[in-house]
Amino acid sequence: MSEIFDAKAFLKTVTSQPGVYRMYDAGGTVIYVGKAKDLKKRLSSYFRSNLASRKTEALVAQIQHIDVTVTHTETEALLLEHNYIKLYQPRYNVLLRDDKSYPFIFLSGDTHPRLAMHRGAKHAKGEYFGPFPNGYAVRETLALLQKIFPIRQCENSVYRNRSRPCLQYQIGRCLGPCVAGLVSEEEYAQQVEYVRLFLSGKDDQVLTQLIARMEKASQDLAFEEAARIRDQIQAVRRVTEKQFVSNAGDDLDVIGVAFDAGMACVHVLFIRQGKVLGSRSYFPKVPGGTELGEVVETFVGQFYLQGSQMRTLPGEILLDFNLSDKTLLADSLSELAGRSIHVQTKPRGDRARYLKLARTNAATALITKLSQQSTITQRLTALAAVLKLPAIKRMECFDISHTMGEQTVASCVVFDANGPLRAEYRRYNIAGITPGDDYAAMNQVLRRRYGKAIEESKIPDVILIDGGKGQLAQAKAVFAELDVPWDKHRPLLLGVAKGADRKAGLEILFFEPEGEGFSLPPDSPALHVIQHIRDESHDHAIGGHRKKRAKVKNTSTLETIEGVGPKRRQMLLKYMGGLQGLRNASVEEIAKVPGISQGLAEKIFWSLKH
């Protein structure tokens, strides 16, 4: 227990009402957030002589201050707790690493509705189907729908400005509502209705309606139409036969858990309208000494009560663990959703099968993750031994990419004890240097990255400079001149140059820009982690450079036209669907773009043609 914090005096001031408490360390950092039905009773439990776990002992030893927020109800306390956890990311709380909103398929409310992927708040008028586990699942479904039900997926800006149908119409993947006369309003509306029914899990209704239309077309001797509908029926049947279908109308999330070697995996199976839309594994950050019950309870609360998750609640949640606050969670979710949400922990029949499947997937994903972590841990340990460091908790690597000196981009990738930290990868656009001067580019990116205050936990143990002696000399010069509040001598600067014939395994490493470097055996685990982070940095730089080059390619032609500034360039490209669409447009079509006069449209047309 802290010598400064007076627990007895503090507890005398605490109420017995429900609420949330925040614990701070000597640096004023929130280290733990908790909720309680009775704040006095809960907080008193931290200062007993016999504490429940080593984790609690370590937590209490660091407490310097506690803030309390009283709430009207337990539900308010539960919501506030998870908002604080998301805000402060306390080190002693179980943390959900990925709380991005899930993607949906969006069917717009336009005159000619379009299909698209959507994330975030649902402001646009239309219908939302999902959620799907990731963007790939949505894109795959959209591609499938486009083959079966050819309704448009183009942006409204493209749709409104077309005078002739696009390639999607030519290959039979869109009915072409953008051009009058290509499809009747009734036919387009019918295909939209099929999509609506299909995404709602009502495949039988789609097939029934299609079969009726096919039979009518045959009776009317419209054999080509009947054959087209027959092909559509076969496509729908092929899709529905492949789907794992549960009881009709099931709308639930199934959550399985695995826990081993201090790591937890929570696997979520998404079932909507009786169909398994997909699944996803999560690996929450678990402080040492945490019990499985706390992992599950905190994960479920953060998963559903933080951010946009509360807008995607299913009717039922199946859990692989009996929560102590199950009733409170169900009541809170029901209150948020405005409808009844059931939380079930001991299902039977098909639901028990779902839970077993989720549990098996969690165990499999955890085994894979532990294996990967073991490998990266071994490699980092080997590298620490080579570099004579006690441990490597964080590494950063830099690379430069450009084309003939143009569109220079620097990348920074970050590894921790578990491998790549992709959320912390960064790209830097380099400007104000002589084209092709990689040394100046490295100098600039290092000053931008490290010439400011950095949190203690974000200071790297090793900074890897891809490029050899010259680049390492730049790094040394930058760090010698840094005037920063953090310990600039802590990171070890390591240069890496490609060896003979630029082959992997022949890399030369440098501690100093002068003198000879040294090599590691091709099968060295230390070399493997260096190759891994260097390749990640190279790929990240190349990716950023390609995006920048593509952007310049799309705008450079327009930049030479007098009267077309950045805003007009952006508007032209947006409304025409890119530079190619603009090249193919007529003067009249260009003049329809907001802010473009007839005279300017003619100038743009002739500039692009000649």
From Swiss-Prot:
Name listed for the protein in its UniProt record: UvrABC system protein C
SUPFAM superfamilies: C-terminal UvrC-binding domain of UvrB (SSF46600), GIY-YIG endonuclease (SSF82771), RuvA domain 2-like (SSF47781)
Location(s) in or outside the cell: Cytoplasm
GO molecular function terms noted in the UniProt entry: DNA binding; excinuclease ABC activity
CDD domains for the chain: GIY-YIG_UvrC_Cho (cd10434)
Record Gene3D superfamilies: 5' to 3' exonuclease, C-terminal subdomain, GIY-YIG endonuclease, UVR domain, UvrC, RNAse H endonuclease domain
A single BP term in Gene Ontology: SOS response
A cellular component annotation (GO) from this entry: cytoplasm
UniProt keyword annotations, A-Z: Cytoplasm, DNA damage, DNA excision, DNA repair, Excision nuclease, SOS response
Self-association state and partner proteins as the record states: Interacts with UvrB in an incision complex.
Residue stretches making up the UVR domain: 204-239
Entry similarity comment: Belongs to the UvrC family.
InterPro entries named among the record's database cross-references: GIY-YIG_endonuc, GIY-YIG_endonuc_sf, GIY-YIG_UvrC_Cho, Hlx-hairpin-Hlx_DNA-bd_motif, RuvA_2-like, UVR_dom, UVR_dom_sf, UvrABC_protein_C
Function: The UvrABC repair system catalyzes the recognition and processing of DNA lesions. UvrC both incises the 5' and 3' sides of the lesion. The N-terminal half is responsible for the 3' incision and the C-terminal half is responsible for the 5' incision.
Stretches assigned to the GIY-YIG domain: 16-94
